Amino acid sequence: MNWRALFKPSAKYSILALLVVGIVIGVVGYFATQQTLHATSTDAFCMSCHSNHSLKNEVLASAHGGGKAGVTVQCQDCHLPHGPVDYLIKKIIVSKDLYGFLTIDGFNTQAWLDENRKEQADKALAYFRGNDSANCQHCHTRIYENQPETMKPMAVRMHTNNFKKDPETRKTCVDCHKGVAHPYPKG
């Protein structure tokens, strides 16, 4: 490829025309990416592959399925990062799950989930521990300071004492609360 040609002014097109075309392509690409990310982050999309097992019912039966506050979490609230760059990276990483859905016999079955639940749960716990349970703290922002009045005194003490520890020795949400949305397997 002739790299010098990329930096030469075009004899055929004006710089303004090239700039406008570049901007239009950039804007269309940006909005197409945003729409794709949004469309693939709905519960309906998640359930298109995870439909034949108990995951959705587990969440609905948990405190995250419409507890006292009346809030029902969506799959992406826990399973996808909330920052734009991390979000895009995670979407790229989990695209391999589509390959698994298409190639692993029985992937979308309760039997597969039961057989692989421990491994999948451990991967999820490692993800949460690796980011200090950022997804939990995205919604539970008041857990360390200005706790809600509905929080039990013992829970206030435990969270306050944990927050006082050095970050390296501090527990993260899933160390005490694993299995709050999906049951954590025994053993």
Curated annotation (Swiss-Prot):
Spectroscopic studies suggest that CymA requires a non-heme cofactor for quinol oxidation. Residues 34-187 are periplasmic. Its cofactor is heme c. Keywords: Cell inner membrane, Cell membrane, Electron transport, Heme, Iron, Membrane, Metal-binding, Translocase, Transmembrane, Transmembrane helix, Transport. It holds the Pfam family Cytochrom_NNT. To simplify its purification, a soluble form of CymA was produced by removing the N-terminal membrane anchor. The truncated form is active and can complement the deletion mutant. The chain crosses the membrane at residues 13-33. Disruption phenotype: Mutant loses the ability to grow with fumarate as a terminal electron acceptor and to reduce iron(III), manganese(IV) and nitrate. It cannot grow with DMSO as the sole electron acceptor and utilize nitrite. Deletion of the gene also severely suppresses selenite reduction. It retains the ability to grow with O(2) or TMAO as electron acceptors. Insertion mutant shows a greatly reduced ability to degrade the xenobiotic compound RDX in comparison with the wild-type strain. It comes from Shewanella oneidensis (strain ATCC 700550 / JCM 31522 / CIP 106686 / LMG 19005 / NCIMB 14063 / MR-1). Induction: Expression is induced in fumarate- and TMAO-grown cells. Its main location: membrane. The lineage of its organism: Bacteria, Pseudomonadati, Pseudomonadota, Gammaproteobacteria, Alteromonadales. Heme c 1 binds at C46, C49, D97. It catalyses: a quinol + 2 Fe(III)-[cytochrome c](out) = a quinone + 2 Fe(II)-[cytochrome c](out) + 2 H(+)(out). One of its GO terms (biological process) is denitrification pathway. This is Tetraheme c-type cytochrome CymA. Residues 1-12 are cytoplasmic. GO terms for cellular component: plasma membrane. Homodimer. It is a single-pass membrane protein. Heme c 3 binds at H64, C136, C139, H140. The keyword Cytoplasm does not apply.
